[in-house]
Amino acid sequence: MNFQVEPPEKKKTKNSSPPHSPPSSSSPSLSLLPEEIVVHCLARISRLYYPTLSLVSKSFRSILSSTELYATRSHLGSTEQCVYLCLWDPSYQFPQWLRLLVNPNRTLANSIIKKRRKKKKTTGQMLVPLTSSKFTSVSKATVVVGSEIYVLGGPVDSAVRVLDCCSHTWRDAPSMNVSRMNAWACFHDGKIYVMGGCQGLKDEPWAEVFNTKTQTWEGLPEPGSEVRKCSIDRSGVIEGKIEFGNVNEMCAYDTKLCKWEYCVNKSAALRSECMIENVSYGFWNMRLLWYDNDIQKDYWKRLEGLESLDDKYMRNGGSSGNTTKLVACGGKLLLLWEGYMKHNPNNRKKIWCAVIAIEKCDGGGVWGIVESVDVLYTVPISCQLLHCLVVSV
């Protein structure tokens, strides 16, 4: 998980030593090392320190923005999971993308906070807006591919925009064959599958697939009227099948057999479903549930230990009608929701975030431990939490 850590302040003493003189030209410097070694050194450092390191020199700035550095981070296994949010206010043309930083020093010690009421209470998380957000459109169809976020379509659009989460810059990818609005997308085995959103025209491919290696689009077989009419509010990849639908019906596309399936009276994957150590977690009916994929014919069970979170969720505007997102990051669950009350004179609402640690119990059970619950952002009541995505960089 990505963390923001501030170094402790050093206490000043009366007999403090005079400031050190600037290093001489003969002092050892990292910049004197071969660039390959510098890249390997920087690749082992958390990305949180990169903005400060970029001030050292132009050569450092060049290395910190290079693709070689992030390739080295991946090779060394030093990548970090980062959370990205997308907020949209209908009064603005473009959505706002933000990066979420989580503080590891925020613990369960609420009693310690109460004992130190004289000190200013600091939040465990913070959101950092990306300045390049205006280069993308509003779209439901977003997928994570490596260290990039693909935004597909928009208000009846075929364009595909890609956010490079290493440099926080946007680029264009090949456009879809069909303009789509409110489409759904999934990533599986190097390919992006896009479904729906094409205004129901039978002469247009209802679904198509994008090969991220060859950067080419290809239409999928005609799914039939039942699949076309299916109302989609969730999607996911299960055992090589692209599943989508709602609580009453489920459709699927078998990527190996290139075949469509339709099942009535069968629910699709839960909303905001994610996985930690082969245990699936989902949010449904204002409850966190879990499902062990290693147990055949297992069933969804309530995640225990979250009574305090349940109470805080309800007291701070959480409801079945509000947007709630659940993601897994760094072995923990992050639950985000829009919280606003009916009586709100300022027409504002808050974006909340709860960090939940997972503990496996004897006998195969799973327990949740609430580490922190914080307000991330205060936004106009018309603003919507569109996406919450986890990217490894």
Curated annotation (Swiss-Prot):
Matching SMART domains: FBOX, Kelch
Gene3D superfamilies: Kelch-type beta propeller
PROSITE patterns xref list: FBOX
InterPro entries: F-box-like_dom_sf, F-box/kelch-repeat_ARATH, F-box_dom, Kelch-typ_b-propeller, Kelch_1
CDD domains per record: F-box_AtAFR-like
Coiled-coil annotated spans: none
Kelch repeats: 148-190, 191-237, 239-272, 273-320
Annotated spans, Disordered: 1-30
Assigned keywords, A-Z: Kelch repeat, Repeat
F-box domain: residues covered: 27-73
Protein name: F-box/kelch-repeat protein At4g19865
Record organism: Arabidopsis thaliana
